[in-house]
Regions:
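Short proline/glycine- and acidic-rich turn/helix-capping motifs at secondary-structure junctions
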Residues: 34-52, 107-119
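A short tyrosine-centered beta-strand micro-motif
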Residues: 207-218
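Intrinsically disordered, low-complexity Pro/Gly/Ser/Thr-rich segments with frequent PxxP/GP/PP motifs
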Residues: 178-205
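A charged, solvent-exposed segment within the mature domains of Sec-exported extracytoplasmic proteins
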Residues: 56-117, 222-236
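Short beta-strand segments enriched in hydrophobic/aromatic residues
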Residues: 86, 200, 218-220
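Primarily secretory-pathway and cell-envelope proteins
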Residues: 113-182, 187-188, 217-237
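Short glycine/threonine-rich beta-strand-turn micro-motifs
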Residues: 1-47, 63-98, 143
Length: 237
């Protein structure tokens, strides 16, 4: 049973005419809709059972790289949606073959890195951001950044960030990543610093050598400012 806007929907199997007669008599109303289950149509009970099995499969799986590609999953009206960092046919096949397969699965996520040519500032009014090292290995799981505050006042920031990379054609694109962040506010006092780490997910999508940009928003005098720090990845580090 579920609501489609204001309409009550009963999911049934078998004879819908008989089911409607029984439900109309029991409820004293005709203001509902029947949805025939069977074949590729799953009831909520069936979907919940499949999700329970999926929970177990994911917990027991040793394929950490495949699990890291999953940002979440849940029961919808007719499918179980599985959200992936990289949602290519190859990644879907990998999940179905090594974690679990079901016709009820529906995948969502980025199929190709999104173009993002945005730029930010790396210093403003005594506030500046820099990578701990200018160059990291393409195999690096994380990159560390330092945000320094010498503005004479306090600044605010959070956990959210994103990373872009320059592709072989010189176009800047967003690095696929888990975009779910805990909502926390930090206050950085004058002459203090904050250390941040950005995950690069090399086990989900092998990163190429080249230029990368880290973006991080801070609030200065109640105004948001997009900070940016550039770094490189190298095969030789």
């Amino acid at each position: 049973i579920y609501f489609d806007k204001a309409t009550l929907v009963f999911q049934v199997t078998g004879d819908t005419v008989k089911a409607r007669q029984i439900l109309e008599k029991a409820s004293g109303s005709k203001n509902f809709r029947l949805e025939l289950m069977g074949g590729s149509n799953y009831s909520q009970t069936q979907l919940l059972a499949i999700q329970k099995e999926l929970n177990k499969k994911i917990e027991e799986s040793g394929y950490e790289n495949i699990k890291r590609n999953v940002t979440g999953y849940g029961v919808g009206l007719r499918h179980i949606e599985i959200r992936l960092i990289v949602n290519t046919p190859e990644k879907q096949k990998e999940f179905r073959e090594k974690i679990m397969d079901s016709p009820a699965f529906q995948f969502s996520g980025v199929t190709e890195p999104i173009i993002n040519q945005k730029v930010g500032v790396n210093h403003i009014n005594g506030i500046y951001i820099r990578p701990e090292y200018p160059v990291y290995s393409t195999a690096a799981e994380q990159v560390t950044f330092i945000l320094n505050n010498y503005s004479g006042g306090t600044i605010e920031c959070g956990e959210r960030y994103y990373v872009t990379f320059e592709d072989e054609k010189g176009i800047w694109r967003e690095l696929p990543m888990n975009t779910a962040f805990v909502s926390i506010a930090y206050v950085i006092q004058d002459k203090r610093e904050r250390e941040m780490r950005a995950s690069l997910y090399p086990d989900v999508h092998p990163n190429k050598a080249g230029r990368y940009r880290y973006f991080y928003e801070v609030t200065i005098n109640r105004k948001p400012v997009l900070m940016m720090a550039e770094f490189r990845l190298s095969d030789n580090e």
